[in-house]
């Protein structure tokens, strides 16, 4: 139990360091490449969502929840991301307070760390095919 506690403490220290702001990220930029980004740096005010952005070879660090709709996740890796929420098409657009919403964004060769993913049902099923060990939690109306 003590070793497990030490491991979790070390992980937290590491993630805090990696996610600290060493450079200024402009959340209004259209393209991000080769950046280490604390997910909170991408949050926009008043429930606005990120739209039509491209992320290439970025490391996106939580803790955070990211809803990715109408986008693309290609050749990306997920570390300590836990379960994935799958949104049924019958729900329509959901208002997810505290969640960073990405609409029509592309994530190419990125690393997600400590980030909960919320995906449309089709995207979640594709993710499950590529990563069978992933647990998908379905959200329906």
Spans of features found by a protein language model:
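N-terminal segments that cap or nucleate solenoid repeat domains
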Residues: 2-65
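Surface-exposed loop/turn motifs in large extracellular/passenger domains
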Residues: 44-51, 67, 80, 92-106
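Acidic/polar low-complexity surface segments
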Residues: 70, 74, 80-94, 126
